[in-house]
């Protein structure tokens, strides 16, 4: 069967599904870093809460200062943990960008009926995709800062609520970290652990699609159009379902990810006239005719 744009699409979609394994692995590593630091964090926070309880709680300025001091403490003790998380995410996404530039090119050229070398985006372009390309209107630095800030905000909300309802430090700690017999899944911190998957999947999808977009732009002589391909299942959003199969000029139109946990991808439509006709034989000519279209 001669190669065609359908073959390129199928291979890129299959690779996009495999990429979700990468995001799950990255999320596991993020959670492992957080979990490793949690016992010490839990003990030190409990000691601080014991001190606040011993001094008494009231809605006045003294308690307000203690709460501000507590939030600074939480940030200080959390900073090394999230610094390690951030470094892990950054380094793995940079490695992903470099790998996907080569993989994307190999997938496309592997389906062409002639020997053809694609132009690979420069290293600085790949790094810019990781660090400067917006993902859901935020760059990577903002995603990572928000991940830590939201974790801290949720903990402070639980502490304030616990103090207002006169809960013990043990009860407040349980609110945050959950019960050990349930693996902490009933605590507010579990939201942070689950959020690792959202962050990993959305950022890795952004890097993957950004690299493909750069690859198409670097080879616009043969990539004239792109097709939006959604992963169609029960989790597909209405917007991605409506865009599935839509064809756009190269570099124009909506670029995935267009929402949190987006799994869509844009695949190229190769113009056979830009590829050429070497080596010339009947099989190649037939395949090129399929690439050119009617």
Language model segments and positions:
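Acidic, glycine-rich two-metal-ion catalytic cores of nucleic acid-processing enzymes
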Residues: 185-282
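N-terminal leader/targeting and assembly helices and adjacent pre-domain segments
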Residues: 1-186, 273-294
